[in-house]
């Protein structure tokens, strides 16, 4: 959510903004983990290109995939989408 100036409420992100935030956050988490995309895919039980497809916007994670990523990186679902 984005805080609007002076209004005291948050504005919902567009789907494009949310997708971009997800990709940016996922990239950050992958880099911070010190693991390769392939290693993460193997540990999650996905094919070797799964993370790359998510990062490039060529695939959308399923609800199960979102839960797996959040658990793997030890973050909340909202944090995975760039919210604090």
Give the ranges of each region predicted by the language model:
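Alpha-helical residues within the helix-turn-helix
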Residues: 31, 42, 71
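Short alpha-helical "recognition helix" segments of helix-turn-helix
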Residues: 36-41, 69
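Recognition helix of helix-turn-helix/homeodomain-like DNA-binding domains
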Residues: 45-61, 83
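Short, basic-rich loop-to-helix N-cap that marks the start of a DNA-contacting helix
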Residues: 58-71
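Short C-terminal boundary/hinge segments that cap the last helix of small helical domains
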Residues: 74-84
């Amino acid at each position: 959510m984005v805080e609007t100036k002076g209004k005291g409420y948050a504005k919902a992100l567009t789907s494009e903004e949310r997708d971009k935030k997800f990709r940016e956050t996922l990239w950050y988490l992958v880099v911070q983990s010190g693991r390769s995309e392939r290693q993460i895919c193997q540990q999650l039980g996905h094919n070797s290109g799964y993370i790359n497809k998510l990062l490039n916007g060529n695939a959308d994670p399923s609800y199960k995939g979102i839960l797996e990523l959040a658990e793997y990186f030890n973050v909340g679902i909202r944090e995975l989408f760039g919210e604090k």
